[in-house]
Amino acid sequence: MVKLRLSSICFAKKKNKFKIIIIAGPTASGKSSLALHLAKKYNGIIINADSQQIYKELPILSSQPNIKAYKKISHKLFNFLDFYKNFSVNQWFKLVKKEIKEAQKKNLLPIIVGGTGMYLNTLLNGLKVLPKIPIGLKNKGKKIIEKIGPKNFYEKLKEKNKTCVYKINPNDKIRLLRSWEIYEVSNKSIYEINKENKVKKLDSYNFYKILIFPPRKLVYLSCKKRWDNMIKLGAIEEVKSLMKKEKKLNKKNLIKTIGFKELKNFLLKKNNMNTTSELTLQATRNYAKRQYTWFRHQFSANIIFKETYEKKNKKYFLKEIQDKLLTN
């Protein structure tokens, strides 16, 4: 039996605010399928909180909903951006607020689904106003961290200001660079700026948070099945098409979706298919590990399911959600 950890929130006291469901969890845990079934049952719309599923050219590699799903339920913030365009968490926050308001007008239940920590953190804790970073400074930071390595970069950043590395893993290049950039521009850490600034929050809504949090082994098995299915669905052709666009537009090394770089090297005959699959699955496992760490420390759920969502446990999931969240 799945053990549930319920928060201390008293749902009966939250009736006056508009209800929003968040379905979160590591990659390949069944979030999208659960969102679809909930949306069908409770007159909902599905809003994307995955940073890779926004791109038009990557429906297969980013595991976007299929055409059948789009036809059954309205999906928002999926498959709308060209691969070479920048898109910040601030932009996502503005769009998601708009979609929530539209759903409220139509009396639809917003179901926000995804595993991108930055998106979910902003949604729940508000938009933090940080200074703009010049491109030249970004490039400088990248060169430094490549030269000295993330651990040395971490130590040097810590010497400047201890709060610059607050809650940052020494191997997390992205967050280390972001922290360094902010400090170079403002002479303050992100932690210090957040304490000073007012944060724009969505206080007029009730967020009911569902976390699918199965053992890693189950997720790794799902990742393997999903990768095999991606190849069958045409992931290689998807990458081939994008490589042509990259060359035509001279927009290289912008795509971060797992599997793209690996299949690109396969098409360039740098690796065989077995090696390509091994590298992709290892990258996926590494990503899942980071997600597990983030959800464990940064996401307080109302319900936690300790298994992947599948057809065989559909009734159980839906009943628990109805009884614990949606009856009040």
What is the meaning of each model-derived region?
Residues 2-328:
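Phosphate/pyrophosphate-binding catalytic cores of soluble transferases and nucleic-acid-acting enzymes
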